Design a protein with these regions (language model features):
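Short glycine/acidic-enriched loop and turn motifs that connect beta-strands
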Residues: 56-58, 100-104, 152-156, 204-207, ...
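Asp-box/BNR beta-propeller loop motif
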Residues: 26-31, 60-75, 109-124, 163-176, ...
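Blade-level signature of beta-propeller repeat domains, shared across WD40, Kelch, NHL, RCC1
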Residues: 326-357
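An edge-strand/N-cap motif at the start of beta-rich repeat modules
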Residues: 23-44
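Repeated scaffold domains used in trafficking and secretory/extracellular systems
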Residues: 37-42, 81-87, 131-138, 183-191, ...
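Coil residues (strongly favoring Ser/Thr
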Residues: 47, 91, 99, 125, ...
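Entry beta-strands of beta-propeller and related beta-repeat scaffolds
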Residues: 48-52, 92-96, 142-148, 195-199, ...
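C-terminal outer-membrane/trafficking sorting elements
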Residues: 364-377, 381-460
């Protein structure tokens, strides 16, 4: 047995291969759907499995399992009205919410399927005579936690209706957010960081001003942001995983965005410097400083821009001249994202791009006396786990070159979790094995003359 272990270590040390993903910022066509309505919603499970929901008068649901080469119409028996949100878990399971079938709403519903639409099971309904659901989402970092929210069932100014799950959607519990006078919620604005922080945008239809509405303690208290954005339908709200930095997009043509650095208490006006008109949605990539803004303008052009510094600087991306973009979602596989976007005309575009992990968090202020690589936790894991390491005092009072790399059993490099100059301290980084099969993997820390290797087990 010892000789076998020694042989595996020899393979690992001397058979390291470098794997470079060829990613592109070019968006390409991934399908066309004719009957999904003006307000479609999209949920990306992985690079191949994507669900889309919408409809004009009745519910419409589609799914692809081959990256958009083919889209299959999912049965909607039991879904009475057009849909206002979708969150998919895999190729068979998904959750949807509805508009309640009238302009004023009332008794809106949430459903789930576990057999690709052969049956839809009612989870809950709002009751009341007003409002409808405005979206349903699960956390990217803690996918067992999800939220859906509805306008106040008793009318504007009354409490908002929420449902929450902490077990992946098996069970849902009712919650609420205090009513704000003469307001209701906005489509496409729901964001979910984790069980503590989530929120959405609200609008006053009389003044057409919108504000953020955010909780940081799991719904016990809600923050009503100080921004007043004139015009409104569709102003989007996104946050970084740090829970402090967030962006709000606007419905205008003057490049305006709003930014917070204190978790939504205060918002300041800024600009992208690039011309996007119409409703501008946003998508913040979890664990990074990368943010996308996309436009539903009816004119063709490059309707997506990208920032890699949390919204300070922006570059335009080629989008195959696809107008009317309504919602974007993605699946992240460490330093690569596969992103899909759906338009109001039923066009779907997708892109595979690289991102930089900003999840290297310094934990504690003490300077370690030794280099150390800790066992990942949890272990076994599925699909996320955290890896801690310590860097001893710097040489010559400078930072050290630190690399933390994950390999497979044959020594093939899978992803660089860290490749940075770091000061002495204790650090933590998160690894996502969502695109990998079950098995044993190695992670290797190197800093100056120090090298340490540990193994971890992914079980799906």
């Amino acid at each position: 047995m010892n000789s076998i272990k020694y042989y595996l270590i020899i393979i690992f040390v001397f058979s390291i291969q470098f794997n470079i993903n060829n990613v592109s910022a070019q968006w390409t066509q991934a399908g066309d759907l004719n009957d999904i309505g003006l307000y479609p919603f999209i949920s990306v499970v992985d690079s191949n499995i994507v669900w889309i929901a919408g409809g004009e008068i009745s519910a419409v649901v589609y799914r692809t399992i081959n990256g958009g080469l083919n889209w299959i119409s999912i049965p909607t028996n039991g879904l009475p009205f057009e849909l206002s949100g979708i969150a998919a878990k895999d190729a068979s399971a998904a959750f949807v919410c509805d508009y309640a079938g009238t302009k004023t709403g009332g008794n809106a519903k949430v459903f789930k399927t576990t057999n690709a639409g052969m049956n839809w099971i009612l989870i809950d309904s709002t009751g009341g005579t007003n409002g409808y659901f405005n979206g349903i989402k699960f956390s990217k970092t803690q996918p067992q936690f999800g939220v859906t929210f509805s306008d106040p069932p008793s009318g504007k100014g009354n409490p908002y209706f929420l449902l929450k799950t902490t077990d992946g959607g098996n069970n849902w519990s009712r919650s609420s957010a205090p009513g704000i006078p003469n307001t209701f919620g906005l489509f496409y604005t729901l964001f979910v960081i984790d069980p503590m922080m989530y929120g959405f945008q609200i609008i006053n239809p009389t003044t057409t001003q919108t504000k953020s509405y955010i909780t940081k303690d799991g719904g016990a208290n809600w923050i009503n942001g100080n921004q007043n954005i004139t015009y409104a339908e569709g102003v989007d709200l996104v946050f970084s995983d740090n829970k402090q930095t967030g962006l709000i997009t606007n419905y205008n043509t003057n490049h305006e965005i709003f930014r917070t650095t204190n978790g939504g208490v205060n918002w300041n006006s800024g600009s992208t410097g690039l011309n996007l008109s119409g409703f501008n949605g946003a998508c913040w990539i979890s664990g990074t400083n990368t943010v996308f803004i996309y436009s539903n303008a009816s004119t063709s052009g490059n309707n997506i821009i990208r920032s890699d510094d949390g919204g300070f600087n922006w570059t335009a991306q080629s989008t195959s001249n696809t107008p009317g973009l309504m919602e974007m979602d993605y699946a992240r596989f460490n330093n690569t994202i596969v992103t899909y976007c759906v338009s109001s005309k039923g066009n779907i575009i997708k892109s595979r791009q690289s991102v930089q992990n900003t999840g290297i968090l310094q934990s504690g202020n003490n300077v370690p006396g030794d280099f150390k690589l800790y066992q990942n936790y949890p272990n076994p894991f599925n699909p996320n786990t955290k890896i801690r390491f310590s860097i001893a005092s710097e040489k010559n009072n400078g930072k050290q070159n630190v690399k933390l790399i994950v390999y497979d059993l044959l020594g093939k490099e899978l992803v660089k979790l860290a490749d940075n100059k770091l000061s002495a301290g204790s650090y933590e980084v998160e690894f996502n094995g969502g695109n990998l099969p079950s098995g044993i993997y190695y992670y290797r820390l190197s800093a100056e003359d120090y090298v340490e290797v540990k193994s971890m087990i992914l079980i799906k």
